[in-house]
Amino acid sequence: MAGADRPRLTSRRGFLLAGAAAVAAGTYGVTGLLQHEPKDTSTAKDVPASQASREITFPLTATCYLAQSSLPPVATLARYDLVVIDHEWPHRVPLDYFIQLRAANPRLRLLAYVNLVDSLSRLGTARNWPDSYALWQFRTPSSSRFPRAWLAHTAAGVLVHEYLDLVMTNLTDVCPSVGGQRFVEYAADWVTGRVWPAGIWDGIYLDAWGDTLWTVDQSQWDITGTGHDVPNAKIYGPGNPLDRGLTSGERTMRSRMPDAILVANGTRTLHAGLLDGLVWESFADPLVHRDPVFDLRGYVTAGAAAAHRRPGVSLTISSRRAPAGSADDYRRARFALAATLMQNGFWAPMGDDYGQPMYYDEMDGAGLGRGYLGHALEPDPPLSVITAATDDGTGSPAPYVYRRDFEHGIALVNVGHTAQHVALRRTYRHLSGITDRLVNNGTAVDLVTIPAQDGVVLLGPPSSP
């Protein structure tokens, strides 16, 4: 699909699947690069970033780029610390693209986007979707031999959907076996045997991979294939068949990819040492009926928990949902980033869809550079620290206002419904903005007013960067 003709889909799955449904064999390439045949990626084993380049300084920035027709220029993606792209891209573009990306930003982490939950009924050509053809067992763009036994359905044969009209797979640990495998075993084999060997990835983003599903269109279904429906309350949630199935898949992936970053949806239960962290779509966004207080508390708690693999990787995703360049656009961006800074997550702002990476003053300090705030003074702060009343340092300086301190500045976020005045006890200064000069005006302050559902990043004393 041409970018101008692509429907505006703010859900990452909806955007990605709109591209996956394209049947045309269109040429894939990198914006700004000559298009030619993809190179063999078998020599790319040294591409992932080294541990030495991954010192955690803040803010941590990300993009979740799911367009299927082209990748942005290297310089665009290299602005971010973490990049998510579809798992098929190593088959479509030259290996040089990824080598240049690493060279441009050595601390960048590259994750493959994978969805094992929503089965596909249509794809593009096998040349452009080879891994998806293998996973879903396609013979032609519209003909698949994927086993019905691995699809979720009721005892009466009614197919189960969790997202739009896409039939959900059966990832439980009691799914019927086909060829001696349950679907979760087959899926883990595919991730470790087809996606990971491309050699360019730092990790995998398992989208829709959660044991608590809120949008399934059936209240019960036949998880065992024996003709007996099981109520949802006995399928989903910690300790139930879906959780156990996902956990077995995570164990397989972790054992075969011990150093890989593995992240899953915010609805996933963390089990010790398996996942690195969670992904929060539409994080703290009241425009899509997310409760900012609930989201922030869950995000901070999950990041501080011992269950995820250390040091942990979490991701919050925000869609613009406001006129570009408007005061509301900038307020929403400040709010989402400041909330993300209350823990160690990467923040991914997206535009009208998941093919529009966004960038705001606060992400690099309006030109100060990556990680301009430096290290956090309280690593992995628990919720009890973030919410503790305080008039200085990390904590809560006013009702529903939270603060976190860094080497070179502070972040404050107001998740409440009323403006709050916050005394700072020392002088800080606003960023000297490029895009938003109204708030980021470079002025020195020792008292700030933070409007409802807004945030601010302030720099430390003038001697700091």
Describe each region flagged by the PLM.
Residues 1-10, 21-27:
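N-terminal secretory signal peptides
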Residues 2, 20-23, 42, 47, ...:
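N-terminal cationic amphipathic segment used for targeting or macromolecule association
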Residues 3-4, 11, 360, 365:
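N-terminal leader/targeting segments
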Residues 7-14, 36, 44:
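Twin-arginine (Tat) signal peptide motif
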Residues 14-34:
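N-terminal export signals
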Residues 29-52:
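C-terminal segment of N-terminal export signals and the immediately downstream linker at the start
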Residues 47-463:
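Glycan-processing catalytic domains of CAZymes
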